[in-house]
């Protein structure tokens, strides 16, 4: 293993942490409708639980309404029930074979709770990134111990790892700020 391998590996892992954080943020409901909100809803499809996207077409009807069109008419009631029981605070309404899912307006108190959740998720993502930094630095120290690189190379590489860490932590902070702004906009 070389210094380049360590740096490349840690950067890829940090980028994956950022992607996972973005996915977590997408699940947090804001006042606006987006189809990603229903991504983790599971529907009972002939005895097995499948994601809603595998049994229905999700569309945005308008800024505050998601349209869910099940591919099979007999699935309408099951899809509606799954959305209702997903504990998202949503109340779907069926019109024929189209399920409309209106986004209720968030109360001020709920907005504040959601910003706390966003900050907490952000901290978790930052901790994950810092743990990756620690692992990379340990790998570099092992290379020095095994006499594969010099201490100067290790110092330069750990500085580079720190720069990567700072860059990714700043990206998490930016994502947290934009999500908070999105939540607090009425």
Swiss-Prot record:
<dbReference type="GO" id="GO:0043023">
    <property type="term" value="F:ribosomal large subunit binding"/>
</dbReference>
<dbReference type="Pfam" id="PF01765">
    <property type="entry name" value="RRF"/>
</dbReference>
<comment type="similarity">
    <text>Belongs to the RRF family.</text>
</comment>
<dbReference type="GO" id="GO:0005829">
    <property type="term" value="C:cytosol"/>
</dbReference>
<dbReference type="InterPro" id="IPR023584">
    <property type="entry name" value="Ribosome_recyc_fac_dom"/>
</dbReference>
<keyword id="KW-0963">Cytoplasm</keyword>
<comment type="function">
    <text>Responsible for the release of ribosomes from messenger RNA at the termination of protein biosynthesis. May increase the efficiency of translation by recycling ribosomes from one round of translation to another.</text>
</comment>
<dbReference type="GO" id="GO:0002184">
    <property type="term" value="P:cytoplasmic translational termination"/>
</dbReference>
<dbReference type="InterPro" id="IPR002661">
    <property type="entry name" value="Ribosome_recyc_fac"/>
</dbReference>
<protein>
    <recommendedName>
        <fullName>Ribosome-recycling factor</fullName>
    </recommendedName>
</protein>
<keyword id="KW-0648">Protein biosynthesis</keyword>
<dbReference type="InterPro" id="IPR036191">
    <property type="entry name" value="RRF_sf"/>
</dbReference>
